[in-house]
Amino acid sequence: MLQANSSNHEITVYDTTELYGEKGKFRVMEFSNKAIQGALDLNHPKRILFEYPRAIIHLMEINEPYFEDVFVIGHGIGTLAGYFAEKRFKIAELDAEVVELSRTYFGYNQDNVVIGDGRYILESEQPNAYDFIILDAFTAAGTPRHLTTSEFFSATHSKLNSRGSIIMNLMGKVEHDPLVNAIHTTLSEQYPYLKSFALPAEGAADIQNILIIGRKRPIQFQARQMAGFTEINLGQGHMIWD
């Protein structure tokens, strides 16, 4: 087991023989709030363990099968960029220690990660440059606020091409979650087409992964390919501004 401290997180990397009830041999990156940032099946390193990246992969492949350029905010262990190794990914990660650990302990071997704040890095990119923008960034308090505002979503819209999509991984409740509803409402001001998805939970009050995709064109998905995620209808919320 390894523990590392950065300016943003206390990070733990450890091996375990059980993960979410499954037996095997796994390596996990975890932050101090027990939030798992990534996990590797050491017996099958190419396997994607978690449902939400599998669902994101499906949304990418079905909505833009020939995509080439992706901007990601939040690196983790580099699951998506590793899966799509032949595509052009640019990843913004605030924490250099996360990137170093992904290379040392999780086999990440690409040279496409920029250290810094994802919003400011994205704002310096060329217009219409990307097919997808993926937001998968968390602090102990959740998704950083400046990555949920109308001004940020306007910037994402300008950096996507005419077929482009933003896909967000959030943590929240399916019903009556003021922040999730506010993010959804704010995003809808910039993108004419939105869909939201969640895994079935024990109760509406459970905190869980929620995926929201915003697109300039109609959104496609096949329910059986969504790794258990089902479409949900989020409520109306307030607008979020800088």
Where are these regions (language model features)?
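SAM/dcSAM-binding transferase cores
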Residues: 1-28, 36-46, 50-54, 58-65, ...
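Short, well-ordered turn and helix-capping elements at secondary-structure junctions
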Residues: 17, 117, 198-200
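Conserved S-adenosyl-L-methionine
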Residues: 191-202
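The AdoMet/dcAdoMet-binding core of the Class I SAM-like
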Residues: 3-8, 44-165, 175-184, 205-207
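General small-molecule cofactor/ligand-binding pocket signal
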Residues: 14, 112-114, 195-197
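Short strand-turn motif at the edge of the Rossmann-like AdoMet-binding core
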Residues: 138, 169-173, 199
